[in-house]
Amino acid sequence: MAMVKRNNNTGMIPVSTKQLLALGAAAGATALQGFVKNNGMAIVEGAVDLTKRAYKAVRRRGGKKQQMINHVGGTGGAIMAPVAVTRQLVGSKPKFTGRTSGSVTVTHREYLSQVNNSTGFQVNGGIVGNLLQLNPLNGTLFSWLPAIASNFDQYTFNSVVLHYVPLCSTTEVGRVAIYFDKDSEDPEPADRVELANYSVLKETAPWAEAMLRVPTDKIKRFCDDSSTSDHKLIDLGQLGIATYGGAGTNAVGDIFISYSVTLYFPQPTNTLLSTRRLDLAGALVTASGPGYLLVSRTATVLTMTFRATGTFVISGTYRCLTATTLGLAGGVNVNSITVVDNIGTDSAFFINCTVSNLPSVVTFTSTGITSATVHCVRATRQNDVSLI
């Protein structure tokens, strides 16, 4: 007689053995699901307990033989020096997006500067004066972005990330620190005590990478047109790079900056030419455009101190009495140059140079130096200034 099951009707439906097994499996799965649902925590605790027992058994096995290796060194989060470490750098393609008329969002990564080690505590290569203020028109921080930002009135940073990439061996001693200060006019930290008090800070060995994510907000600020008296009102803040504890002043790494910034309200293009003028007493009377360099003078030396890296064309003239002598210091290399001396009255110069790291200084030595006018702009080596 065949096995049957009864339905709502009075008719009988024959069921095979295969169908009966399927029905039993479905019922068993439903029951198991309910058991796991009601006893899930107990099952997890049992599995953890079983794992602990197995781990202890492995440690006890072999008597007093050492099963684990203990390393003397750091606490949790410490990084052991590898034999070698490297990083492959891939080019970044800028992205432009815009959802509303009159604005554009720019996303890109730029090279900021080479980092040199130092024995004592040093910030931004020893250059003081709020070097890396976070503003799209700050030519000392950005080399590519100002050409676009100069066409807009306001900005909002959506994200900013500093990335330190080492280029030294793992035997290099010292420390590299990158930090963010919300006040763009605060003086640079004077020592390690002040540095340690920054809330947004990353420190690392020269051979280890580090990334610093800068906190941003949604506030619209004005782009720096060099006529602002209070930079706190227009800057998101300022960045800083500190080094200390090294054995020398060799290059140890590079700093890159990645950002996403939204620019608002197109305007006539702002100047990208830096102009600095000194009066007869040597006082600064004109400072317009990006702060690529600082200009100062004594009666015998005209000094131009760079505040940014890259390739520049410098042109200028100054009153003096005798022929001039060129002087270079730091990571500056002259690509082409023309100097014209008008003995007894003044001298003029045109220099195409590349600055690889800070500090870098160009000087002219003469006598009777008084007033001076110096222009500086980013360029390429093809902008040859030599006289044919």
UniProtKB/Swiss-Prot annotation:
Disulfide feature: none
GO cellular component: T=3 icosahedral viral capsid
InterPro entries, alphabetized: Capsid_prot_S-dom_vir, Coat_P, Viral_coat
Residue ranges of coiled coil: none
Region (R domain, interaction with RNA): 1-102
Keyword Nucleotidyltransferase: no
Subcellular location: Virion
GO molecular function: RNA binding; structural molecule activity
Ranges for region Involved in encapsidation: 56-61
Metal-binding as UniProt keyword: no
Record region (P domain, projecting): 265-388
Gene3D superfamilies, A to Z: 2.60.120.20
Record's keyword terms, sorted: Capsid protein, RNA-binding, T=3 icosahedral capsid protein, Virion
S domain, virion shell: region residues: 103-264
Pfam families, alphabetized: Coat_P, Viral_coat
Family indicated by similarity: Belongs to the icosahedral plant coat protein family.
Primary role: Capsid protein self-assembles to form an icosahedral capsid with a T=3 symmetry, about 32-35 nm in diameter, and consisting of 180 capsid proteins.
Subunit description: Homomultimer.
The name this protein goes by in its record: Capsid protein
